[in-house]
């Protein structure tokens, strides 16, 4: 704040034991280890369910990045309806749902429906009557590794650069010049014809 009027000059009064409140990160390595242990504990707790949820394949926004596809937040309600899975039930079987996302591309819609159908075909669901020994025989998987997001192959490859004989620019330039110098060219041609006629008379 600027100095103004007959008021006392502002000053920061850091006298509240600020040295005790300085935040440091000396435990960075320890935190990393504890986060890893936490992930392992969570994975063991939910086993043999997948570690993560199935995500849709979406095209990245903006002109800069829309050439690539990536994993999205969740499947749309329309995509789930096409496969015949209720949104609430989808969350219980490891499928992420995003009710806000809208399908604006038929290509992406079809790709995600196929992704859901593939996941559904490989899904194993246990009921309460299933024995623990049967459950333990199944291996816990990482969904993002089992169903990876693959970049689509380009439809057309690189083409050779060909320079045509007639270009639009060249055609327009010739037409413009023809219009611009039409009168003077006609005048010169007329003068030349008259000169030749006089020469022939002599």
Swiss-Prot record:
One of its GO terms (molecular function) is RNA binding. One of its GO terms (biological process) is translation. Residues 183-202 are annotated as: Disordered. It holds the Pfam family Ribosomal_L13e. The keyword Cytoplasm applies. PROSITE patterns: RIBOSOMAL_L13E. It is found in: Cytoplasm. GO terms for cellular component: cell surface; cytosolic large ribosomal subunit; preribosome. Keywords: Cytoplasm, Ribonucleoprotein, Ribosomal protein. HAMAP family: Ribosomal_eL13. Component of the large ribosomal subunit. Mature ribosomes consist of a small (40S) and a large (60S) subunit. The 40S subunit contains about 32 different proteins and 1 molecule of RNA (18S). The 60S subunit contains 45 different proteins and 3 molecules of RNA (25S, 5.8S and 5S). PANTHER family: 60S RIBOSOMAL PROTEIN L13, LARGE RIBOSOMAL SUBUNIT PROTEIN EL13. Belongs to the eukaryotic ribosomal protein eL13 family. Component of the ribosome, a large ribonucleoprotein complex responsible for the synthesis of proteins in the cell. The small ribosomal subunit (SSU) binds messenger RNAs (mRNAs) and translates the encoded message by selecting cognate aminoacyl-transfer RNA (tRNA) molecules. The large subunit (LSU) contains the ribosomal catalytic site termed the peptidyl transferase center (PTC), which catalyzes the formation of peptide bonds, thereby polymerizing the amino acids delivered by tRNAs into a polypeptide chain. This is Large ribosomal subunit protein eL13. It comes from Candida albicans (strain SC5314 / ATCC MYA-2876) (Yeast).
